[in-house]
């Protein structure tokens, strides 16, 4: 029995290596090519910094990058949670009252088409310069639309045979929602989260370019570029990449836990 468990564990481990391996190999090859290009063509730091210099600046400024990441990450997390809750709530409303979808959807599309910098500029004028609210509101809006579209699709695009079977047993609309629509929408929710999680970091990051406190990753990148410290700026970009990767990884872990819960 223990031998079978060991074999099963080995197979799963090998499967994970096969999934991650190509990405790791590609990443290492890309960094090696980047480093070689900078050294081979003698590119100046103000044009393109070498990965070795970026890594050096990353560890040299680690505490500052961490502080900036907590600010940007905090704004992204607040917006992600609020946007997800609002998106789920509105998707339930739209699935119950279909006529509202015809009214809300065009407005949502129009609002989502407005460039980030325009909305951030308007929000910055509405609040004090020391407020983090504009950035969090911007993240909330981006996440809200992603979650709304996906979850609403999961709630409405169910098999008609399942709904008809429930109705043949005189099931209420709430029972149909709980037994059919919600289980069907769960995969759509996690698909939305895997998109919204890194998008929340990107939005918080970009929002910092257009005013407000100069304490996040985007602001630090701008200030370092202005002072011709390109390697340091790239180090903050690396911090932003790691932050986005962390958010995405958490969304995958949550999906895995949900699947294990369903299996039980």
Please tell me what each predicted stretch does.
Residues 10-12, 40-81:
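Periplasmic/extracellular loop-to-transmembrane helix junction in inner-membrane transport proteins
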Residues 14-40:
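N-terminal signal-anchor transmembrane alpha helix
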Residues 78-108:
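Transmembrane-helix boundary motif in ABC transporter permease subunits
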Residues 98, 235-264:
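C-terminal transmembrane helix and the adjacent membrane-cytosol boundary/short C-terminal tail
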Residues 109-146, 153-154:
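Generic hydrophobic transmembrane alpha-helix motif, especially the helices
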Residues 137-141, 174-207:
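Transmembrane alpha-helices
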Residues 153-189, 221:
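Short cytoplasmic-facing helical segments at TM-TM junctions of multi-pass membrane proteins
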Residues 192-242, 249:
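Non-cytoplasmic
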């Amino acid at each position: 029995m223990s031998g079978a468990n060991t074999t099963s564990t080995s197979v799963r481990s090998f499967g994970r290596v096969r999934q991650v391996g190509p990405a790791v190999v590609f990443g290492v090859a890309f960094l090696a090519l980047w480093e070689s290009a900078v050294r081979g063509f003698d590119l100046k730091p103000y044009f393109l910094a070498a990965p070795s210099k970026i890594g050096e600046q990353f560890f040299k400024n680690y505490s500052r990058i961490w502080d900036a990441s907590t600010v940007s990450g905090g704004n992204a997390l607040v917006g992600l949670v609020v946007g997800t809750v609002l998106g789920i709530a509105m998707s339930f409303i739209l699935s119950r009252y279909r006529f509202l979808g015809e009214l809300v959807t065009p407005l949502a599309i129009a609002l989502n088409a407005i460039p980030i910098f325009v909305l951030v500029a308007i929000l910055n004028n509405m609040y004090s310069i020391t407020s983090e609210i504009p950035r969090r509101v911007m993240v909330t809006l981006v996440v809200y639309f992603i979650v709304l579209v996906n979850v609403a699709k999961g709630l409405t695009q169910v098999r008609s045979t399942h709904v008809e079977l429930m109705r043949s047993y005189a099931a209420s609309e709430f029972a149909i929602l709980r037994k059919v629509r919600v289980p069907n929408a769960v995969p759509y929710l996690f698909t939305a989260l895997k998109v919204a999680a890194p998008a929340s970091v990107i939005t918080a990051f970009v929002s910092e370019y257009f005013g407000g406190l100069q304490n996040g990753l985007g602001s630090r990148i701008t200030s370092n570029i202005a002072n011709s410290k390109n390697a340091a700026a790239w180090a903050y970009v690396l911090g932003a990449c790691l932050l986005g990767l962390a958010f995405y990884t958490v969304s995958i872990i949550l999906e895995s836990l949900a699947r294990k819960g369903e299996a039980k």
